[in-house]
């Protein structure tokens, strides 16, 4: 056995690897892992998934674990359905509200003071917690990784699968550690930090990976700043951050 192999075998697991292992239910010959999903967020563009669910005569497996929050086409002012700019966006929200009520999901409706951008509401309301596996039909679901969870975006068919089973088949990404040393200078924001990282590794540098951020500069970030860094992991091509 080579020294390299010994190091690989004895290396402590990263946070991503621990969460993946803790949520693993089964694996298949294609190299995919069946993961249990702790939190599922859906928005008004999730109608395709609900159509698939109902078309297959399936029910939501764990309604309490899914949170429906209209946020993609909601108006910046006004809390009534009539405030929407056109009939199409009104129909999308009505559809989400109807599906949420029909399936007894957690709904943050238009007049709910907790409602906002999904990836802000989850951390702000304590729905997103460390160690969780989290999905949403939105690429920037990685934002929730800032709180120490594994969070990634999924497509409509996967959203339907999560609704029906509270599980998801996924190939295991590789892990990439990015160590940001030192302290930020005055005026350097979290967005500058992540843009600097993307500038170093490239817009596809994180492809096939979950990026795990470390180092003094990261430790000194506020939660809000960490949300920004993890949000933009997608711009580095990563699966999550």
Kindly give the residue locations of the regions a language model identified.
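Fe-S-dependent hydro-lyases/dehydratases of central metabolism
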Residues: 1-241
């Amino acid at each position: 056995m080579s020294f390299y192999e010994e190091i690989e075998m004895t290396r402590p697991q990263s946070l991503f690897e621990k969460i993946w292992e803790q949520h693993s239910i089964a694996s298949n010959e294609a190299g995919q892992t069946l993961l249990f999903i702790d939190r599922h967020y859906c928005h008004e563009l999730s109608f395709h998934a609900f159509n698939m669910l109902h078309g297959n005569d399936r029910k939501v497996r764990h309604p309490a674990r899914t949170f429906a929050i209209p946020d993609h086409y909601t108006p910046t002012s006004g809390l009534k359905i009539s405030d929407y700019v056109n009939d199409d966006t009104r129909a999308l929200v009505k559809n989400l509200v109807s599906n949420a009520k029909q399936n007894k999901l957690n709904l943050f409706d238009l007049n709910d003071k907790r409602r906002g951008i999904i990836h802000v509401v989850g951390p702000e309301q304590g729905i997103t917690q460390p160690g969780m596996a989290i999905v949403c039909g939105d690429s920037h679901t990685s934002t929730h990784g800032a709180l120490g969870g594994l969070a990634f975006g999924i497509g409509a068919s996967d959203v339907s699968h999560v609704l029906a089973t509270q599980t998801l088949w996924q190939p295991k990404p590789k892990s990439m550690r990015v160590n940001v040393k030192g302290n930020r200078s005055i005026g350097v924001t979290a967005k500058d930090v992540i843009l600097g990282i993307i500038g170093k590794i490239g817009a596809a540098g994180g492809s096939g990976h979950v990026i795990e951020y470390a180092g003094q500069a990261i430790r000194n970030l506020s939660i809000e700043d960490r949300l920004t860094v993890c949000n933009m992991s997608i711009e580095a091509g990563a699966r999550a951050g």
